[in-house]
A protein has these predicted regions:
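C-terminal hydrophobic helical "lid"/dimerization subdomain
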Residues: 1-3, 247-251, 291-344
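Short N-terminal strand-loop motif that marks the start
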Residues: 1-60, 123, 343-344
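Glycine-rich beta-strand-centered segment in the early N-terminal region that forms part
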Residues: 20-34, 47-94, 136-138
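Cysteine-cluster motifs in flexible loop/terminal segments that predominantly coordinate metals
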Residues: 37, 82-133
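Mid-domain Rossmann-like dinucleotide-binding core that forms the NAD(H)/NADP(H) cofactor-binding site
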Residues: 130, 136-218, 222
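Glycine-rich cofactor phosphate-binding loops and adjacent beta1-alpha1 units
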Residues: 160-162, 203-282
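Rossmann-fold dehydrogenase core element
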Residues: 258-260, 271-311
């Protein structure tokens, strides 16, 4: 069996692995689709040594084998990879912070003892049974592969403290930005503005329900001032993952407003602390999600309150991964969410 690994800057290698067998508390999943994530693009651009299980972490598939101690799954079950439930016994859990479970976090970043030696850019993968969730029967295979990034945005909006009627700005119309925009609307924002330089992505934001989609810089500044009577946005979601966007988010917010940091920049950001202080900006940040939020988000996709299909821009085989990552890393790609189908 072969899996595609990002092994260095601009380098994807096909590496051969033995056909997997399940651990006693694990399952083997035949992968249907695996989405390309911003983390994969960062790894490809930077060559940073991410754990092999990190790249290719947005996958869905079918259980093909299970360990002797696994009772909750059977062969043929459709499943999606997710963050494990809180363990209940680590220091964070005992302190009443199950949402900061250290064991679940280690599994999420691929550093627990049962972490696989590769991610989901493969035909199949062995994984702890605690890491998978049964797919809602209403979801297609493609929708299932997009639940994971959708839940990242879901968690961020839940943490952000948005209020009914707020003027909300979402910076960036990639998969996370478009997901955040949809959840912000579902949370009751009065006006939702997407700031995005790419014309095609702006059009997609409008299709998915944004009230406005505008270019960054002066056009965005003027629109926000116009809609807020000169005050600024109540809350700004930073989904670009570039250093310059952090201060830009604060610049768009009103005094007493909020900024939610979701995009992960791989370099330090230059900020103007005085503007943060003068505006008394409240800041939240969001990484991944809680296990129970996965079920919530999946249910809302299943009943039509969140749309994934327009964000799915293309499907490729594993042999097209290198080219796709190069395109996405260029900064000029019009692709939104590319799914890898290892069966092609």
């Amino acid at each position: 069996m072969f899996a595609a690994l990002i092994t260095g800057k601009g380098t994807v290698e096909m590496v051969e692995f033995a056909d997997p067998t399940p651990a006693p508390k694990g399952v083997v999943v035949d992968i249907s689709f695996c989405g390309i994530c911003g983390t994969d693009i960062h790894a490809y651009q930077s060559g940073k040594p991410y754990h092999p299980a990190i790249c290719g972490h947005e996958w869905a598939g079918v259980v093909s084998a299970k360990g002797a101690e696994v009772k909750s799954f059977t062969e043929g079950d459709r499943v999606i990879v997710a963050t494990a439930p809180a363990c209940g016994s680590c220091e964070a859990c005992r302190a009443g912070q199950a949402d900061r479970c250290q064991v679940a976090f280690l599994s999420m970043i691929g550093r627990d003892p049962l972490a696989p030696a590769h991610g989901g850019f493969a035909q199949r993968i062995p994984v702890a049974a605690a890491r998978v969730v049964k797919t809602n029967t209403a979801l297609t295979e493609q929708q299932a592969a997009m639940v994971e990034p959708t839940t990242v945005a879901f968690h961020a909006v839940r943490r952000s403290g948005i209020h009914l009627g707020d003027i909300a700005v979402v910076q960036g119309a990639g998969p996370i930005g478009l997901g955040t925009m949809q959840w912000v609307k579902a949370a009751g924002a009065g006006v939702v503005i997407v700031v995005e330089p790419n014309e095609q992505r702006r059009a997609l934001a409008i299709e998915l329900g944004a009230h406005y989609a505008i270019e960054p810089g002066e056009p965005a500044d003027q629109l926000v001032k116009q809609l807020s009577h000169g005050l600024g946005a109540d809350i700004v979601y930073e989904c670009v993952g570039r250093p310059f966007a952090v201060q830009a988010a604060v610049d768009l917010a009103r005094r007493g407003g909020s900024m939610c940091l979701i995009g992960l920049a791989d370099q330090d950001a230059a900020i103007t602390p005085g503007s943060w202080l003068i505006k008394e900006i409240s800041v939240t940040s969001a990484l991944a999600y809680m296990h129970e939020e996965f079920e919530m988000a999946m249910g809302m996709i299943a009943d039509g309150r969140f749309r994934t299909e327009p964000m799915h821009s293309s499907t490729i085989g594993i042999d097209g991964l290198d080219t796709a990552l190069s395109d996405l890393a260029s900064g000029t790609s019009t692709q939104t969410k590319i799914l890898v189908d290892p069966r092609l």
